[in-house]
Amino acid sequence: MVPTDHPKRLLALVSFAGILALLSFALWPVFLISLGQEWGLSNTDIGTVSGAYFMGYLVATPILVGLTDRIDARLVFLGGCAFGGVGCLGFGILADGFWSASLTWALVGAGLAGTYMPGLQILNARLDDAARVRSVPWYTACFGIGTGASFGVMGTVLAFADWQVAAYLGAGGSVLAALLVLFQVRACPPAPVPASQKKRHPLDLRPAFRKPVALGYIFAYGTHTYELFAFRTWSFALLVFLAGRADGGFGIGAVTTIVSLITVTGMLASLLGARICLAYGRHRVIALIGATTALVSLLVAFSLTGPVWLVVLGLWVYNGFIMLDSGALTTGTVEAGDRHDRGALLAVHSMIGFGGGALGGPVVGYVLDQAGGADMIGAWFYALLAMGAGSAIVFSIQRHFWRRMA
C-alpha cells in the first residue's frame, strides 16, 4: 500500500498509530491496587509511580519534540515507539517495587513524548493551514480514544491474566504503531528557516516565551493536564471503591467498561469544545469551561454519599467537562506559532502540560493518605476537590486573556 497524502486518510492513519502507541497507558492505573498491595506501597507511592510516567514525558519532550523543527517528525515518532516498547518490556521483566516500577514506567512516558506531539507535527508538516486547524482537535481527541481503549484492554487482562501480560501487550502496541508510520507515512523534510532568521538549536525553546498568547494556552494546559491525569490515574480505583458500596456490587468487568466509556466519550466533548471556541472565542469559552468544571468537581464530591449510580453519572459528566477544553488549548498553541518554530511551542506546551500531569497522581495520592486512605468516602471527597483545583486555575488564566482582548 502506497503512503497517503490525502488529509483525511493521513489524519486517520496517524491517529490510529497514536492509539496503538497508547495501548500501555492504563497499565499502571488498572493494576495499581493489586501491585500497590503486593509491593507494600502507600497511596503517595502509587501516585508517584504514576507521576514517573509524566516525568519521563517531561524530560524527553524538549529533545524529541524540539527535534521536529530540524528533522522529519516521522523519525521522532519511530524513536518514541522504541522507547515505549523497551519501557513496557522492562516493566514486565524488571519491575518488583517502587524504584524499578518508577524507572521503567518513566521510560514508557518518554515514549509518549516521542509519539504524541511528534504525531501532531507529522500532520502539521503535511497539511495546509485550513486542514491543520480542522485536524488538530480530531487528533488530540484521539488521545481519549487511545486511553479509553487502553483501559478496556488492560481491564480485560486484569480479569483474565496478569500485569506482565499487560506489559507485553503494551510493547506490542508500540511495535505496530512504528510499523504503520514507517510504511504508510511518506518522508517529509522540515520547513526551511527563513533567511531573515538565525537557525535555531533544537533545544532552544525561547520562541515559545516570546509569545504571550501562546503562554496563556500553555500554562492553562498545564493545570488542565494536572486535573485530567489525576482523574485518569485514580478513576479506576475510585470506581472499584464505589463497586464495593453498590447494592449487590459490580465486578471488574463492569468497572473496566465504565472507565473505557467515560474515557472514550471524552473525545466527543473535546471536539465539541473546539467547535464552540471557533464560534464564540477561544479565551472566553475556555474560561467558562474552567469555572464550570471546577463547580462540577465540587458537586460530584458532595454526591459521594448518595446512590452509586448517581456518583458514576457525575464522574462521567465531570470527565466530559475536563475534556471540553483539551483540544481547544492545543489548537490555541498551534495557531499562536509559525511553521518554523511550532516544534518549540509544542515542546514547551508538552513540557508544562505533562509537568502538570506528573503532579496530578502524587498530589491526589497524598490527599488520600492524609484524609484516611482510599477506602474512606471522606478521602475521596478531598481528592475530587484537589482534582477540580486544576480547572479553577484554567479559569483564572484564560479570564485574564479574555478581558485583555475584549
What are these regions (language model features)?
Residues 28-29, 214-259:
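Extracytoplasmic gate region of multi-pass secondary transporters
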Residues 59-95:
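Conserved MFS/SLC helix-loop-helix module at the cytosolic interface between two early adjacent transmembrane helices
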Residues 82-96, 292-305:
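C-terminal ends and interior cores of transmembrane alpha-helices
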Residues 104-142:
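Cytoplasmic helix-loop-helix junction between adjacent transmembrane helices
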Residues 139-185:
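Helix-loop-helix hairpin linking two adjacent transmembrane segments in secondary transporters
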Residues 179-184, 383-406:
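Multi-pass alpha-helical transporter architecture, strongest
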Residues 183-204:
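Flexible cytoplasmic inter-helical loops of multi-pass small-molecule transporters
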Residues 283-329:
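C-terminal transmembrane helical hairpin of 12-TM major facilitator-type secondary transporters
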